[in-house]
């Protein structure tokens, strides 16, 4: 297999690739994450993943580059990473007692080809008290995460139900990625 590069500094994505025993190196993409005029959350995450992969692939032509992006949506509103604790609190209050969607887009890119895909997962939160939200925000955990929570961390206690790929909510749909990567590297046509 060609050298595999993760175009992300996300510790969660690194952990998931290690969990799947995928050898890789990290080259952080310096792409500014801006959401343009896309028609759907799926289009947004796939476009951002592709931008990240493309930026790194330009200087690593003999490698397979992985770009990924995750967003949370509720009621047609996109919830990215909060800019501060106040915005994190607003997001968590918005999600309290409700079901929201998490989209993770993935792009695999080499000199020969590019494959993009996404996973959509529904997450339902318990009703959260203001105190629970404040205590969680004080941990600083939500400040670098889309939707202001980490399902794999202390934010797990907010989750009542999940429908879809848990690891996609963490940041990378690892089971599907491994299958896509095998097909990508084998030269098989992608359906």
Swiss-Prot record:
It catalyses: dTTP + H2O = dTMP + diphosphate + H(+); UTP + H2O = UMP + diphosphate + H(+). One of its GO terms (molecular function) is dTTP diphosphatase activity. The record marks 12, 70, 152 as: Important for substrate specificity. One of its GO terms (cellular component) is cytoplasm. It comes from Bacillus cytotoxicus (strain DSM 22905 / CIP 110041 / 391-98 / NVH 391-98). It comes from the Bacteria. It is found in: Cytoplasm. It is an enzyme of class 3 (hydrolase). Nucleoside triphosphate pyrophosphatase that hydrolyzes dTTP and UTP. May have a dual role in cell division arrest and in preventing the incorporation of modified nucleotides into cellular nucleic acids. This is dTTP/UTP pyrophosphatase. Keywords: Cytoplasm, Hydrolase, Nucleotide metabolism. The lineage of its organism: Bacteria, Bacillati, Bacillota, Bacilli, Bacillales. The keyword Cytoplasm applies. The keyword Disulfide bond does not apply. Its cofactor is a divalent metal cation. Belongs to the Maf family. YhdE subfamily. SUPFAM superfamilies: ITPase-like. The active site is at residue 69. GO terms for biological process: nucleotide metabolic process. Its EC number is 3.6.1.9.
């Amino acid at each position: 297999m060609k050298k595999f590069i993760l175009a992300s500094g996300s510790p969660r994505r690194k952990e998931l690739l290690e969990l799947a025993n995928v050898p890789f190196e990290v080259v952080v993409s310096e792409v500014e994450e801006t959401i343009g005029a896309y028609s759907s959350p799926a289009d947004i995450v796939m476009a951002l993943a592709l931008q990240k992969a493309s930026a790194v692939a330009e200087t690593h032509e003999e490698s397979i580059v992985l770009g990924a992006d995750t967003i949370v949506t509720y009621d047609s509103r996109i919830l990215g990473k909060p800019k501060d604790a106040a915005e994190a609190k607003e997001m968590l209050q918005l999600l309290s007692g409700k079901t929201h969607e998490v989209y993770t887009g993935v792009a695999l890119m080499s000199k020969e080809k590019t494959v993009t895909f996404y996973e959509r997962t529904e997450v339902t939160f318990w009703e959260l008290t203001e105190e629970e939200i404040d205590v969680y925000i004080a941990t600083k955990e939500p400040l670098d995460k889309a939707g202001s929570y980490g399902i794999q961390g202390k934010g797990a206690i907010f989750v009542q139900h999940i429908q879809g790929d848990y690891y996609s909510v963490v940041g990378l749909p690892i089971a599907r990625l491994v299958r896509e990567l095998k097909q990508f590297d084998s030269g098989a046509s992608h359906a």
